[in-house]
Amino acid sequence: MYPNWGRYGGSSHYPPPPVPPPPPPVALPEASPGPGYSSSTAPAAPSSSGFMSFREQHLAQLQQLQQMHQKQMQCVLQPHHLPPPPLPPPPVMPGGGYGDWQPPPPPMPPPPGPALSYQKQQQYKHQMIHHQRDGPPGLVPMELESPPESPPVPPGSYMPPSQSYMPPPQPPPSYYPPSSAQPYLPPAQPSPSKPQLPPPPPSIPSGNKTTIQQEPLETGAKNKNAEQKQAAPEPDPSTMTPQEQQQYWYRQHLLSLQQRTKVHLPGHKKGLVTAKDVPEPIKEEAPVPATSQIAEPLAAEEPPLPPPNEEMPPPLPPEEPQNNSSEMSEDPEEDARLKQLQAAAAHWQQHQQHRVGFQYQGIMQRHTQLQQILQQYQQVIQHSPHIQTMSLDVQLRHYEMQQQQFQRLYQEWEREFQLWEEQLHSYPHKDQLEEYEKQWKSWQGHMRATQTYLQEKVTSFQAVKNQYMGNMAMPPPFVPYSQMPPPLPTMPPPVLPPSLPPPVMPPALPSTIPPPGMPPPVMPPSLPTSVPPPGMPPSLSSAVLPPPSLSSAGPPPVLPPPSLSGAPPVLPLPPLSSATPPPGIPPPGVPQGMPPQLTAPVPPASSSQNSQVPEKPRQALLPTPVSFGSTPPSPYHPPPQSEQGNSKPLNKVFSSEQGLGESSSALSQSVIAAKDTPVKSGGLLADPPKGSFLEGPRGPREQKEQLQKLKDFGSEPQTADHLPPPDSRLQNTSRPGMYPPPGSYRPPPPMGKPPGSIVRPSAPPARSCVPMTRPPVPIPPPPPPPPPPPPPPPVIKPKTSSVKQERWDEDSFFGLWDTNDDQGLNSEFKRDTAAIPSAPVLPPPPVHPSIPPPGPMPMGMPPMSKPPPVQHTVDYGHGRDMPTNKVEQIPYGERITLRPDPLPERSAFDADHAGQRDRYDRDRDREPYFDRQSNMTDHRDFKRDRETHRDRDRVLDYERDRFDRERRPRDDRNQSYRDKKDHSSSRRGGFDRPSYDRKSDRPPYEGPPMFGGERRTYPEERMPLPAPSLGHQPPPVPRVEKKPESKNVDDILKPPGRESRPERIVVIMRGLPGSGKTHVAKLIRDKEVEFGGPAPRVLSLDDYFIAEVEKEEKDPDSGKKVKKKVMEYEYEADMEETYRTSMFKTFKKTLDDGFFPFIILDAINDRVRHFDQFWSAAKTKGFEVYLAEMSADNQTCGKRNIHGRKLKEINKMAEHWEAAPRHMMRLDIRSLLQDAAIEEVEMEDFDANIEDQKEEKKDAEEEESELGYIPKSKWEMDTSEAKLDKLDGLRTGTKRKRDWEAIASRMEDYLQLPDDYETRASEPGKKRVRWADLEEKKDADRKRAIGFVVGQTDWEKITDESGHLAERALNRTKYI
């Protein structure tokens, strides 16, 4: 896994760093060792020779990255890592930061690993890790003998890699970061410091990396770095104390935000990067590696990973840039920016807001949980490296078991995801965590897509079982590749390449790669193919030779490998494949081999390479570039030039990122190389330029997919793919054919690189001629004989389709086969290689691969991806895998789409619309990556409609498409398509137009595009955005919600919500006159005060219309008329605008003063322009703005409004009412009105009680005045009794008698009396006699209780203890 990253994920480390470190040449010897070594050594060699090429690659990558940054914010992610650079060092997986890099070659070997046992790969991995720790990178290279095994980690078997990946990264969180760091480190290979630099913030570390890269020479440093890395990663989230974690996360968080601002990118990726560093990032990254691994074996599965990978890749690209920084001109900028970011990060850290820290920490911990699930997911999704070489039954069982395991994991994920979502929503600054949110949501879509994918995989295998059983025979070809296995590692390199390849490849390709020594041959073919030259020269000379050259020249490829971190010799290629085989290896790795293939010597190359490659890494059958070369070597070797071209294209891709011009030249060079290579087919070269390049990218991804598919189907697909590609594909413009072959090669990439990475690289390769070359070679090498299988190509497609085509169909096929397709794919590729416009062909690569492999990935993967446009399913995984790649944005389903586009059909389409394709490619290149992607989606749909064959090819494909379509409404697609078309037409004119130009078009998509997964979402959102056509509101773009976001007023005013509410709030009231705006404003103010807040400032436009008026009133006392000054509301329409302007000034001053954290704006605001300026001003000052819209029917408003506005006016206002922009948050004030209504009722009840109390008081007073209580009715029984008492002189508290309760309370008195007395008392209606003495006694008691009262006290009564006085009362006579 790491390897994948390293490049983009685990693997990425390898490619980027190598570029900068010239010392890597030392490593070169390792690569140098020989073909056998080639895999493992290749990494080393690649590092040295690759370093130069790496530099160039870095430059190219840098540009790509920059574009990616802007488009995907991946760069930002890197910056995030910057602070975590130490963490990155944790490339535990790599073993030692440096060692691992050295091992990159081993990672490359892992590709062979596919053949190799997964365990072996893992073994190797561990060894590598140990070596790295020890600091003997050499060791790893030495292990190269079984480099495939070691490489397994990266490509060997993506699965193993992921597993290793996961385990190596001791801390899961660090795990990812390490992968980031590690990948970078590997690039730094030369110096351990580099590993440190590799820290996730590739971009930021770029400067450091440069330095480090130079340092890399020291193994000790390496070890240290590795240790640091390990430590850092762990410290990252796991080791740190909660406080440290919080700071670390927060710092990264802020960093990403800052970077986003700087880059003016959605920042989506940035967030990811940060996330990466943080557990979340790890999660993403880990998933990515897993994906890569899975992708390699299981394209479909890979796709899931891609999302993380994409995220991962984004960071890697930055890292690559860092690596580039050492050798790239852009590096300086990157470095400067990184330094800025670092400084900013430090600053942010110091000024962290501790208040939200803990909440943030909780969210990050939840991220860790999700990441752990993703890590398990990676393990579940892993495939044995050789899964694709196994029988359909075995694969079917494998997927069925995987599906069961995944179901449990998926349920757990859903649970955790919901918890995380709840936590996030309660987080006050969740808008700052948009990147995380998008990332996890894209993962959510990814998990769902994986579920669907696994189901489809099982279904497709069952359906394909019969179809492909025949093709299974094809596996033999692959078997040769099996021998090629060594090359397989190459595949892994591709994995790595994704992250690093682009940068590494381009730089190394031109010159560094040559250093290995192969360069001469490769280099001659094409500048970029410096690396290829090592392997290429032979390939050029003869198909066979190239492969060996590759394997033996592995070192040269190695250079690329560093970038690719794939099979050493092959690896170099892989890097190329990832990065566009910087060296001769057509980035895919197959490219190098392919050139030979291209050459007539397909078979020879195959044998040669096989023999040679086998030596190195048998493991990587397809993956190894050599293996590629071997199977497709013959064809590919001719492609060597092509590849060289490819590598150049890679450079181009990078350069394309850097500058279209360069990519263009690279393209032409690659084309020229192809022409030189014509051996394979002029068509290849000729077509390639147009489609081949385009296809190339596709090819790589597809290749990978195909490889995987072949593995899945036993290589049978490869044969089909290969054969057809050479013939029909080449004819097709090589776009379909060629790429498909690459596709077959592609499979290798899957190994190490996530499909995404491959995809991405694939785009670059497309740029490079490799795709062209590849098309000829296609996967045919093994199937060279099977050329007859031209039909198979379609089949292959299906086969691939099951795995690769799924994605390719949508992703690569669209661009590859159709002009539209091209456009779709190309659009992606072009976006990546915006610079590559010159070579529309290149665009195809971008189509899908590029998308997936944002910058670097394309490089590593492109070679692979290129040839295999055919790959359907695999790419599905790739797309996902390439978190960086736009592909990821394509819904899982789409990518997975098995429906294979018949290569022929595509090619036919291409041929028909070659011109159009070129134009499309150009547009695509011009278009921003994302736009292209969106376009691609549309194209895909379009293509689908147009090409029934595809659907007919596979019902599964169709279903997948349907799934994709559902995921992404066609509307979205169409819209994006339309947008793209418009843009493309404008773009057409300026081929050179940087992708940045397109940015504006993409804004809506931008956020999501970063995460491929979101892409689908964005388009949907985007559609809605247009809807919010409150024309005014371009601002809506920020929150392009289908439904405007709404917040309940209780969540802001009442606890517990008010604890987590934004610190500064503005509420804008809007509604018709009389709708209750002022009333609600007062309610809000009162509520705020009620819960302990300061009284909000209420700014009302009505206040401006209140004037002082003199009124004549009658003085009630004198009856005279008196003039009084009164404040009255007088509406003056003429003054409204003036008053509004005045109020706006007041509002701004209030914002600036900062005395009022809560401001309420009370005005009609019937037009958006009336309140839009307020909204903007408040937002600028950091206020959260809520829109409270009052609703009431016109009649009610007419009656209620206190300002005398007429119903006519109100109706007119309502008719011309403007809806608020969607991006403005709504405030739901219904609960406030309900509370107010309830309170009113309560008040009434309360009033009633008060009245009762008043009544009682009055009664008491009356009693005191001896007027008696106020009777309810004169004749009530009570009354008579009361009167009797009065007559008897026994006045008692009448108040008590008032109700029966009072009477009951007096029962005690009655109980003391004789029965006769009680009886008589019970006859209130009759006059009766009372016991005067008893009554007198009671009266005395009462008086005693009252005490002395002036003027009333009867001392006799009070002092009469014995009762004599009372007895005397019996003698008194009373007259009644």
From Swiss-Prot:
Sites of N6-methyllysine modification: 675
Comp. bias intervals (Basic residues): 261-271
Chain positions covered by the region annotation Disordered: 1-335, 511-1058
A Pfam match: AAA_33
InterPro entries: P-loop_NTPase, YLP_motif_con_p1
SUPFAM superfamilies: P-loop containing nucleoside triphosphate hydrolases
Polar residues composition-biased segments: 207-216, 238-260, 642-671
Any one of the GO CC terms: nucleus
GO molecular function: DNA-binding transcription repressor activity, RNA polymerase II-specific
Subcellular location: Nucleus; Nucleus speckle
Quaternary structure, from the entry: Interacts with PPP1CA and NCOA5. Forms a complex with ILF2, ILF3, KHDRBS1, RBMX, NCOA5 and PPP1CA.
UniProt crosslink position (Glycyl lysine isopeptide (Lys-Gly) (interchain with G-Cter in SUMO2)): 886, 943
Main location: nucleus
Protein name per the record: YLP motif-containing protein 1
One GO term of the biological process aspect: negative regulation of transcription by RNA polymerase II
Entry-linked PANTHER family: YLP MOTIF CONTAINING PROTEIN NUCLEAR PROTEIN ZAP, YLP MOTIF-CONTAINING PROTEIN 1
Stretches with biased composition (Pro residues): 14-27, 81-93, 102-114, 148-158, 166-176, 184-204, 303-320, 511-537, 545-594, 632-641, 738-753, 773-796, 840-870
